[in-house]
């Protein structure tokens, strides 16, 4: 089977797209994917919400809900709104 360059590019894009899909944890709304600096996959964190409509992440100094504070999570390496109680 002979593959043309456009076919190779097409399948490469499909594989790349499938590899960049965010994993659905327990959040209600998944954010969009985008390729960030250093080629790392990042979610549109300002749009991703927990099931109680509070943001899970707090990039760019966004406010967290009541009884939550913005802290660095070493496991995910992201700023998250974590329960302060």
UniProtKB/Swiss-Prot annotation:
Residues 21-43 form a propeptide. Keywords: Cleavage on pair of basic residues, Disulfide bond, Knottin, Secreted, Signal, Toxin. Transmembrane segments: none annotated. One of its GO terms (molecular function) is toxin activity. It is found in: Secreted. Its main location: secreted. Residues 1-20 form the signal peptide. GO terms for cellular component: extracellular region. The keyword Disulfide bond applies. It comes from the Eukaryota. The presence of a 'disulfide through disulfide knot' structurally defines this protein as a knottin. The cysteine framework is VI/VII (C-C-CC-C-C). This is Augerpeptide-s6a. It comes from Terebra subulata (Chocolate spotted auger).
């Amino acid at each position: 089977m002979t593959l043309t360059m456009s076919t190779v590019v097409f399948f490469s894009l499909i594989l790349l797209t499938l590899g960049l899909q965010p994993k659905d944890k327990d959040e209600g709304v998944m954010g969009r994917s985008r390729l960030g600096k250093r080629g790392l996959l990042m979610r549109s964190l300002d749009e991703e919400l927990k099931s109680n409509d509070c943001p899970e992440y707090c990039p760019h100094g966004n406010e967290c809900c009541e009884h939550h504070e913005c802290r660095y999570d070493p496991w995910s390496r992201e700023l998250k709104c974590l329960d302060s109680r």
